[in-house]
Amino acid sequence: MENIMTLPKIKQVRAWFTGGAIAEKGAGGGDYHDQGANHWIDDHIATPMSKYRDYEQSRQSFGINVLGTLVVEVEAENGQTGFAVSTAGEMGCFIVEKHLNRFIEGKCVSDIKLIHDQMLNATLYYSGSGGLVMNTISCVDLALWDLFGKVVGLPVYKLLGGAVRDEIQFYATGARPDLAKEMGFIGGKMPTHWGPHDGDAGIRKDAAMVADMREKCGEDFWLMLDCWMSQDVNYATKLAHACAPYNLKWIEECLPPQQYEGYRELKHNAPAGMMVTSGEHHGTLQSFRTLSETGIDIMQPDVGWCGGLTTLVEIAAIAKSRGQLVVPHGSSVYSHHAVITFTNTPFSEFLMTSPDCSTMRPQFDPILLNEPVPVNGRIHKSVLDKPGFGVELNRDCNLKRPYSH
């Protein structure tokens, strides 16, 4: 009889944070909205707060960067460690060290689904439909997958069953699709800058932006719009039709997460051939099931916010059963290892974090070391052939551990 590998138990879980409200602006890391001055990601992007003039110009003005980066590290009895990052900051540290630790420590490193289910059910009374608590659970889940991969000496994508393609092709999210085309990406997704409070003038301005980029990028390059929950059905419908002459591939997250009937109506109203997408700010498996039922074309969970890799795999199955694509909101290596195993993810997102979108910069810079970036718009599966998620924690990032147990 062949010997079966004996897996260690988890000795300890630890949580740090960096950045956030008490830090100097521009920490980056897991909270990639926390960028310095003159960055495209904070330049008059339409949001649900844009109707208030005091908060129209900058997303940081209403506090999009107050949470900061959460780092969760799990250590096995044999001394090996796994870690992950997300957006939950000091409050996430409290949840990990004072609540979730009891479900993690003492478990086998392979007990990921058991730990995941216990974390979800134990936080139901204060987690609601996602948000901070789900970000924290996601971070723990990703750290567990990282540890498991390192213990058995395999990349996470092989733990999920292996790659279904040799490489991942990417579109770029940022203010300059024309530069993204030069870098080899298959498409460019731009943020909208105007919303319902701006009336038809706002529609004309954003449509003119799309028209300008279509002229610069040519007919075959994908162009998309990211509306970041800032619209209503009527405005989104008018914007979609205004952009139809410029072959807009999809219009994304026009409505707040729970407006399921609105998404159903928008899909019905959208021009023929234009896709409707959403999911970035949905935080539970149940919400993705309901979102799928609206008939949208692509679901876009963030693996660091939706419940982690364990939930992302389940979301992909829901989408596949309905003939929908799942294209995760850009989350770097944590998405790469998943999407290369999904048959219904033919491409993925890369978020441009350089200030003017002119250079390639790792999304979670500087918190991750050895974080890969696309080359000519692609990442080959061989780049992912390292144990776990294949990245290391940069411990020079002023990490703080405010709680212990």
From Swiss-Prot:
Cofactor(s) named in the record: Mg(2+)
Top-level taxon: Bacteria
Catalysed reaction equations from the record: L-rhamnonate = 2-dehydro-3-deoxy-L-rhamnonate + H2O
Stored CDD domains: MR_like_2 (cd03327)
Main enzyme class: lyase
Annotated PROSITE patterns: MR_MLE_1
GO molecular function annotation: L-rhamnonate dehydratase activity; magnesium ion binding
UniProt-annotated binding residues for substrate: 33, 59, 349
GO biological process: amino acid catabolic process; carbohydrate catabolic process
Record bears the keyword Magnesium: yes
Alphabetic keyword roster: Lyase, Magnesium, Metal-binding
Cross-referenced Pfam families: MR_MLE_C, MR_MLE_N
Self-association state and partner proteins as the record states: Homooctamer; tetramer of dimers.
Family label: Belongs to the mandelate racemase/muconate lactonizing enzyme family. RhamD subfamily.
Protein name: L-rhamnonate dehydratase
Species whose genome carries this gene: Escherichia coli O1:K1 / APEC
Gene: rhmD
